[in-house]
Regions:
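Carbohydrate-active catalytic/glycan-binding domains of CAZyme proteins
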Residues: 1-305
Length: 305
């Protein structure tokens, strides 16, 4: 478990070198008092593990840029991918001049997974209103990086909202494509609206030959139609099965991972090749935010996908 005495930790992503797991996580000081303030004071922490359980904290990987920059308020969720001997990190940035409303996606690179350099072209992916809704608190965040299955460049899957459908169920998987991880083309969403308001922290993986989409849904982001259809279902991490890593996915039939307090879950293979689920422990639905990252949970024990 990753627990820090002076900081809350929440959303995270993992880079696997084959010998070590590097975890990057959002963190904010508990001295803020109110856990809601953590969102506007987030930096990206870094820790290293050999077994996904015991973590050596390695400091802060990214902080917001100085006042006046496009990412001057907080640095949010992303993902890491290695290409041509260099690690590439896509992450979400917000700025203080608009109180963090406008979310944009940026690129940083590293040779050693410790020291990160922001790309001069940042932000590299911005919302395209042809396909994605601009709302008071804009949904354009949490990019998940993957190589194109056919070898044609790279894809980013993004938490986004469609421009049509019931307002409480417009959440979709946004999509951008790149030939080189620097130049990005925003494309139409990879899923249809209709179930949730937001599909947060998406990830795709090929689990024993089955393409799986994993995302998380907050209690107030479950659409009314789905809530009426599944009144006993709680919110949290959700698993949907697809036809490929780029969809389509059967989100209407998606299943919630039945682990209390778990949120922003990730799928990771351990050294034995077994799929494990990790997530941060929330607890705010019960009145107390926890802010720790769980130990791994074997996916097969959860009966998923």
């Amino acid at each position: 478990m990753l627990r820090l005495p002076d900081r809350w930790v929440w959303d995270f992503w993992i880079a696997d070198t084959g010998s070590e797991y590097h975890i990057y996580f959002l963190q904010a000081p508990k001295s803020l008092g109110d856990q809601v303030k953590r969102h506007w004071n987030a930096t990206v922490g870094h820790a290293v593990s050999a077994n996904l359980r015991d973590w050596d904290v390695a400091g802060t990987a990214l902080r917001p840029d100085p006042p006046g920059s496009w990412e001057s308020m907080a640095t949010w969720t992303g993902s890491v991918l290695e290409h041509d001997g260099l690690w590439h990190l896509l992450y979400t940035g917000t700025r203080s001049t608009d109180s963090g409303v406008e979310q944009r996606i940026a690129l940083a690179t590293s040779a050693d997974l410790s020291t990160w350099t922001r790309h001069p072209s940042n932000p590299v992916i911005e919302l395209d209103p042809r396909w994605y809704e601009r709302v008071e608190h804009e949904a354009w965040r949490d990019p998940w990086l993957l190589r194109d299955p056919a070898g044609n460049g790279f894809h980013a899957l993004i938490t986004a909202r469609a421009t049509t459908g019931e307002p409480d169920a417009r959440g979709v998987i946004g999509h951008a494509w790149s030939p080189d991880l620097v130049r990005w083309e925003v494309r139409p969403p990879l899923s249809e609206p209709g179930e949730f308001g937001h599909l947060e922290v998406p990830q795709v993986a090929l689990v024993d030959g089955t393409p799986v989409l994993l995302f998380s849904v907050a209690p107030d982001r479950v659409g009314a139609a789905r809530r009426a259809r599944r009144p006993a279902e709680h919110s949290g991490p959700v698993v949907a099965v697809g036809e490929s890593l780029l969809g389509p996915w059967d989100i209407a039939a998606a299943r919630v991972i039945p682990v209390p307090d778990l949120y922003s879950a990730r799928l990771v293979r351990d050294r034995a090749g077994e799929w494990q689920v990790l997530g941060f422990l929330d607890g705010s639905a019960r009145g107390t935010f926890i802010g720790e990252i769980s130990d791994p949970i074997p996916l097969r024990e959860l009966g998923l996908p």
